[in-house]
């Protein structure tokens, strides 16, 4: 394992302390990285309506943890959790370590089985979108959960059968939407109806059986 500590003094914001810790043992490996800046000085703008000044006096931070491991040669798992204090964090401070994705922070729990016939995957997955301000229409969907089962059978005469299937519950956090489908903007008080395809919370099932024949050369 190894660790890195990174202190930074950022003009118009303050003192930030960041770090990364990586480890490897057996068939498991992972890392955690993050930074913390207490009591942000608010940037160089004195306009309280300027996005640069939106977080004056607030603690700014992010954390990103990932882990991958195996129970057996066929059964593996992965976990990831990323979060930030606000959607503008990377615009203001960037990202210090190896991961360069600054548009989303992923949350994931996954268990996968790779067999000779069946491949199975179960996961819960979501994202924090790093935009500020974040439009309600741009809020990402969570998969809670997503279950996949795929299989293939091959015969000596060239015939084969396949089964591909997935069932996923999609969930989207639309703040301010009431039970009648109306969304109210807290700042302006304006209301509008949320279309079903826009909310789109619900279960999706995909089943794809197939049969075929492949000629041997």
List each model region and its residues.
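Outer-membrane beta-barrel proteins and related beta-barrel translocases across Gram-negative bacteria
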Residues: 1-217
